[in-house]
Regions:
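Short glycine/serine/threonine-rich phosphate/pyrophosphate-binding segments
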Residues: 14-24, 48-49, 84, 92-93, ...
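C-terminal non-catalytic interaction/assembly regions of soluble proteins
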Residues: 256-407
């Protein structure tokens, strides 16, 4: 008996999250004997609760489906809705009644840690009530902090953007040789510094910028930082320093908190910003050289110009494999990437229990960080470099990229 499929996106978008959506939709269209309607949740599980859905097959009638693959952001819209911990909460029967009324047999959620938490809760509730709906998580996060997977879709393109921007910033900073300067680049990363570590890929030779890289995996020492900056300025007069937004001192206080109060989001996460500005002012006051801070901000996750072909292909494949896994009877699983080889780079796809993934964070390994805590080792470079390979040619019109727009 045919069943309907529904797919949604949640959390912060990436440049390739729609690649996974494209993979889910196109693979589902190939299985006409098992899958009938293909629905998209508008604004994730929260939108679905409010009855907001769309027919994904309608994209065939326009050029939207072909544009979807290379469109950044979340085509279906996102949410940060957290399902209750208590599986006896009335929201669960409400959701499953809606699933039943729409004939849903396959549920796909494309997202990061909190999204996998949603898949976990829904699959556990399904087991509790003996529902045969299959729940699959398709990973995405530029933070690259999901466990049980070599890396996550979205990280490769964001890493390519970060490394490209840092290389360009370093060139710009070096145009004047008669005045010392320090440029601080603040990069996304709350508790895991994978994206900031990727700034090391910008270097063309030993001793090239960025000379200093600080991750949240190690405690940030303000005085040691100032000493390092002074030392580096002797050999690198136009110094570039890359920091994660979540760097903190030995007591766990975020550097950005030293600059003032910060708010929290709906999941209780502190909204981190301002670490670069704080260090800019610190260097200006204590060392007295020309300073500038740059916050890469949302461009890290929405730049289509720096798409990694490797990342986009893997993102699409994650969606494809997700559909195949559900049709084989798997549920409560997340698609994972298994690296078979670095040179040449080889990858395979598997599934892992989402309950062992959600609410866990994968940090940059300590042996990939230098002993002084202000750089990464060659092991990280070997890990990250394959993920940024390949350029994606975007469809264009009048000199600008063409994207899919949900109306």
């Amino acid at each position: 008996m045919k069943k309907n499929l529904i797919v949604g996106q949640s959390g912060g978008p990436t440049a390739v999250i729609n690649g996974s959506l494209y993979g889910v939709v196109t693979e589902a269209m190939r299985h006409t004997e098992e899958i009938d309607e293909i629905y998209g949740m508008i604004n994730g599980i929260e939108g679905f609760l409010n009855g907001h859905m769309m027919d994904m097959r309608s994209l065939i009638e326009t050029n939207e489906l072909s544009l979807l693959r290379t469109t950044p952001g979340s085509y279906l819209g996102s949410c940060r809705y957290k399902l209750p911990e208590d599986l006896n909460d009335p929201v669960y029967p409400l959701l499953f009644n809606k699933f039943t009324s729409h004939g849903i047999g396959y549920f796909f959620y494309i997202g990061g840690n909190d999204s996998m938490d949603t898949v976990s809760k829904l699959s556990r509730y399904a087991k509790k009530i003996n529902s045969d709906i299959r729940f699959i998580g398709v990973p995405k996060t530029i933070d690259n902090d999901l466990v049980h997977t070599d890396h996550t879709p979205g990280f490769g393109s964001a890493a390519k953007y970060v490394a490209s921007m840092v290389r360009e910033v370093a060139i710009d900073a070096s145009v004047y040789d008669n005045k010392k300067s320090v440029t601080t680049v603040e990069i996304m990363g709350r508790h895991a510094g994978w994206l900031t570590a990727a700034s090391a890929l910008a270097r063309k030779y030993d001793g090239d910028n960025p000379r200093l890289i600080y991750l949240p995996e190690t405690a940030f020492d303000q005085e040691a930082f100032l000493k390092k900056v002074q030392e580096m300025l002797e050999t690198t007069p136009n110094l570039v320093v890359c920091i994660s937004e979540g760097i903190h001192d030995k007591n766990g206080t975020f550097v950005c908190e030293l600059a003032g109060d910060i708010g929290t989001d709906t999941f209780g996460h502190k909204m981190l910003t301002g670490s670069g500005k704080y260090l800019e002012n610190l260097v200006k006051e204590r060392i007295g050289v020309k300073v500038r801070s740059i916050e890469l901000n949302v461009c890290q996750r929405c730049s289509s110009e720096y798409l990694s072909a490797t990342d986009l292909n893997e993102s699409e494949n994650a969606g494809i494999v997700g559909v195949q896994a559900a049709l084989k009877g798997e549920t409560g699983k997340m698609i994972t990437f298994i690296r078979n080889c670095d040179l040449p780079y080889e990858l395979s796809y598997e599934t892992a229990d989402v309950n062992e993934i959600c609410n866990m964070e994968k940090a940059v390994p300590s042996d990939w960080i230098t002993e002084d805590g202000c750089d990464v080792t060659e092991a990280f470079i070997q890990y990250a470099r394959p993920l940024i390979q390949g350029k994606v040619v975007l469809p264009e019109e009048n000199g600008l990229p063409l994207f899919a727009y949900r109306k």
